[in-house]
């Protein structure tokens, strides 16, 4: 989102460029421009490289092709478009002290900027709802939200985001009426985003605040349910060990099943924390800007131009953070390492007993005599011993079907996030 007003030179001269020696001042300005250009280039490269890596990893490795990760792809696409079509032109606008791409591209660029932010926050909102359904209605989850339905949801998110971003800007509903704004609209070299009060408030509420409130409310509920499940695991685990200590000493299989189930549940709750970090980071990066965006149109000149632009760029930098956050997930970490040739791509075993072969397909390589399920191996396998294990199977994900293996253990599949 372009800066309000035309005072974007502050990034070019730390001391106001008022040194008595003109040559010294010019050298400082040039050094500052070079430094800012390098910093902005690093930001653009980090955004593009990181999000291309995320999209490629999910597209290549079946293990990562879960419903939740479809939404992650949508989020990565929004960040990638931000890195390719928004941030570079914003950097040019600041470094060149003027807009060099004409009025049409100015409005189109601004529309893309609003589109990416809106699509990101709405996708995060959908992810929160997705996790809420998965953790509260595990038996219904896979029938409620299939991969095809997820694609439809993603399409709807982008359509709604497009309508709320392109329509008001291309129809000029956003335009202010004071002289400085009108002059900028007609000037080819000016691309400052002057808006009227109604648009600034309405667009901020629709594109950011409403999805943010929904996301925070739903995800707080998800964590409450997850906390209760972890407490249930602790109680059941203690009860199991007390009742079956002698059996565990004679045959370690039951204890192994419990530890494995507990480990699975903890892994799923760690995935929830990862998604929570993604949402929290997005909020911290963009909330200050949207607060300032409303304050600016209510009280003009109250917010310094420097603050407005810096907060706008704090939001841009958020697009580079998500790929780093995904590295909390062992599955994403391994996929990234294989794509970057830091790990051999054949028969590398995941921590949960899966291995990824050279064609990106995931196979289970755990214990012998495992459950034979007639479904794709991209789904997580969870085999549990019957005694005392009620409630562990649906600790986070879904249990569409149960089967029993040769050792009498209950088996289930789960569409795991991240």
From Swiss-Prot:
Extracellular membrane side: 1-34, 96-106, 175-196, 299-305
Q: How is it modified after translation?
A: Palmitoylated; may reduce accessibility of Ser-345 and Ser-346 by anchoring Cys-341 to the plasma membrane. Agonist stimulation promotes depalmitoylation and further allows Ser-345 and Ser-346 phosphorylation.
Q: Which UniProt keywords apply?
A: Cell membrane, Disulfide bond, Endosome, G-protein coupled receptor, Glycoprotein, Golgi apparatus, Hydroxylation, Lipoprotein, Membrane, Palmitate, Phosphoprotein, Receptor, Transducer, Transmembrane, Transmembrane helix, Ubl conjugation
Q: Does the keyword Ribonucleoprotein apply?
A: no
UniProt modified residues of type 4-hydroxyproline: 387, 400
Q: Which InterPro entries match?
A: ADR_fam, ADRB2_rcpt, GPCR_Rhodpsn, GPCR_Rhodpsn_7TM
Q: A single GO BP annotation from the record?
A: heat generation
Give the glycosylated residues. Answer: 6, 15
Write out the GO MF terms.
Answer: adenylate cyclase binding; amyloid-beta binding; beta2-adrenergic receptor activity; enzyme binding; norepinephrine binding; potassium channel regulator activity; protein homodimerization activity; protein-containing complex binding
Q: Which residues carry this modification: Phosphotyrosine?
A: 141
Cystine bridges: which residues? 106-191, 184-190
**Annotated segments matching region Disordered:** 1-23
- Tell me the compartments it is located in: Cell membrane; Early endosome; Golgi apparatus
* GO CC terms in record: apical plasma membrane; ciliary basal body; early endosome; Golgi apparatus; intercellular bridge; membrane; mitotic spindle; neuronal dense core vesicle
- Sorted alphabetically, which Gene3D superfamilies does this protein's record hold? Rhodopsin 7-helix transmembrane proteins (1.20.1070.10)
Q: Which CDD domains match?
A: 7tmA_Beta2_AR
Sequence similarity: Belongs to the G-protein coupled receptor 1 family. Adrenergic receptor subfamily. ADRB2 sub-subfamily.
**Function summary:** Beta-adrenergic receptors mediate the catecholamine-induced activation of adenylate cyclase through the action of G proteins. The beta-2-adrenergic receptor binds epinephrine with an approximately 30-fold greater affinity than it does norepinephrine.
Q: What is this protein called?
A: Beta-2 adrenergic receptor
What organism does the UniProt record list as the source?
Mus musculus
- Lineage summary: Eukaryota, Metazoa, Chordata, Craniata, Vertebrata
Query: What's the gene?
Result: Adrb2
């Amino acid at each position: 989102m372009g800066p309000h007003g035309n005072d974007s030179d502050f990034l070019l001269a730390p001391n106001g460029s008022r040194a008595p020696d003109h040559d010294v001042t010019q050298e400082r300005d040039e050094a500052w421009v070079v430094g800012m250009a390098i910093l902005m280039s690093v930001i653009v490269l980090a955004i593009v490289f990181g999000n291309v890596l995320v999209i490629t990893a999910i597209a290549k490795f079946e293990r990562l092709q879960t419903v939740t990760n479809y939404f992650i792809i949508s989020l990565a696409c929004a960040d990638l478009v931000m890195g390719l079509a928004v941030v570079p032109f914003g950097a040019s606008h600041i470094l060149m002290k003027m807009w060099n791409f004409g009025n049409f591209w100015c409005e189109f660029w601004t529309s893309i900027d609003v589109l990416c932010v809106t699509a990101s926050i709405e996708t995060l909102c959908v992810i929160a709802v997705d996790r809420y359904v998965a953790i509260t209605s595990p038996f219904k989850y896979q029938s409620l939200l299939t991969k095809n339905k997820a694609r439809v949801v993603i399409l709807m998110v982008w359509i709604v985001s497009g309508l709320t971003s392109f329509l008001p800007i291309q129809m000029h509903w956003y335009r202010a009426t004071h002289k400085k704004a009108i002059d900028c609209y007609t000037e080819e070299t000016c691309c400052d985003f002057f808006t009227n009060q109604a648009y600034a408030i309405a667009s901020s509420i629709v594109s950011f605040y409403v999805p943010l409130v929904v996301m925070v409310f739903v995800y707080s509920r998800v964590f409450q349910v997850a906390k209760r499940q972890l407490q249930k695991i602790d109680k059941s685990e203690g009860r199991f060990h007390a009742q079956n200590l002698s059996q565990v000493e004679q045959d370690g299989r039951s204890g192994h099943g419990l530890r494995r189930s507990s480990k699975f549940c903890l892994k799923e709750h760690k995935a929830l924390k990862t998604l929570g970090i993604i949402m929290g980071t997005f909020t911290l990066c963009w909330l200050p800007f949207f607060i300032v965006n409303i304050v600016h149109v209510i009280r003009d000149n109250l917010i310094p131009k420097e603050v407005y632009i810096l907060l706008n760029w704090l939001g841009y930098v958020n697009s580079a953070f998500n790929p780093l956050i995904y590295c909390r997930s062992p599955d994403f970490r391994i996929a990234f390492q294989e794509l970057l040739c830091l790990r051999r791509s054949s028969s590398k075993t995941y921590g949960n007993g899966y291995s990824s072969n050279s064609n990106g397909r995931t196979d289970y390589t755990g214990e012998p005599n495992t459950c034979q399920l007639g479904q794709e191996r991209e789904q997580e396998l969870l085999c549990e011993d019957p005694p005392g294990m009620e409630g562990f199977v649906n600790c986070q994900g879904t249990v569409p079907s149960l089967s029993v293996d040769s050792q009498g253990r209950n088996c289930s599949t789960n569409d795991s996030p991240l």
